[in-house]
Structure formats: structure tokens, C-alpha cells
Amino acid sequence: MADIEDYAAFCHKFGDQVDAYANMDVIGDAAATYENQCVMEDLGLHPLPVFHRGDDWKYLDDYLKGDHDYIAFGGVADPRDRKAANKWMGKVISHIVEFNPTIKTHAFGVTSPEELVKYRFFSCDSSTWCDAFRYNKYQFYKGHGVLEEIDVQESRKRIGLHYGSVPLDGKFKHSLTTWKKRMEFIDRIIPSSEQPFRKAEIDQLSV
């Protein structure tokens, strides 16, 4: 497992090749996550601070009061309790908008059109697009941001091809193309992260 110095060295080497990189978070330990943030900044790096559901809110306030215009959030995509995760995220966004509405937000593990539109994340990431070749599930894009997933046996009936026989690189390309179409649709419908929230929208964030 990489330690913070190894990760910092990696970011120094490749950081200029990406749009952004996040702090090395320690899930369940907000203090250790904050310490890693400080270490990386002391080394001349500018990682996105990471705030997780369950962390003490004082850490979010510390990040907001610091020189950070872009913050990442974890715990948003909790399939065990989606309602609670969404309520928490709504409170977070409301808090940020009140403090500084120009701060950009990144969501770990989120690709739901509804959540991306509601919270206006500036960016997001997810490994769900890999499910097709990780679990042999054929995904195809139905339009309007909707994906349908079918199992290997059903794929022969639906597409005339047993998906299990498709080479890995073929599954990779298909999944990449499918998810690209989905995200292009979401990009078209999501409000700009620079567009101010109306009061009625803020009131609905935690609902």
C-alpha cells in the first residue's frame, strides 16, 4: 500500500498531466485525511481536499476557509442507504453555497443523472462503466441517460451474440462507447456549476 510520500511523489511526477488530483483520504479517519492534505500542501502540491459522509463538519469548514476552490466528496454513492446519503449531500451543498457558491465540487462514485443535475457537481467519477467486463454484463444505451443491463445468456437473444465470447478489449471498447453516450447526454442537461442555485432549489437539496 502506498504511503503519503509515495503518492505525493507520484503527483509531482504526473500532476501536470491531469486536470486535478485528490488528497489521499483515509476513510473513517477525518483527522488522518486532513493530516495528509497538510503534508501534500507542505510539499508544494494542491490536491482536492476530500470530505466523507460521517466526517466531523469542522473539517469541511477548515477546507472552505483555506485556499481551496475545488473539494471532493465521498460517501455520496452509498447503495445501502441512498436516501441518507442524498440528504447529507444536500446539506453539504447548501452549506457550501452559503459560504462560497463559486467553490467547485467533485463526487466520488456518482453517475446518476438525477443526482448530478440536483447537486450540480463540477465533476464526478465512477468505476461502474467497468461492470460490463468485470461481471460479464452487457450494457447498452437506450437514450435519455438510461442504460439497460442484460446477462450473458440474454445477450444472445437480444443482440445475436454471446457476450461472454467477446474478447476483453471488445468489451472494454463497447462499455467505453456506451458510457460516453450516457455522459454526453448528462452534460447537455446538467445546469452549469457556475449557475447560482435559486432559493427554492436550495430548499429541496436535502429532501
What is the predicted role of each segment?
Residues 1-6, 10, 17-62, 68-85, ...:
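Catalytic beta/alpha-barrel core
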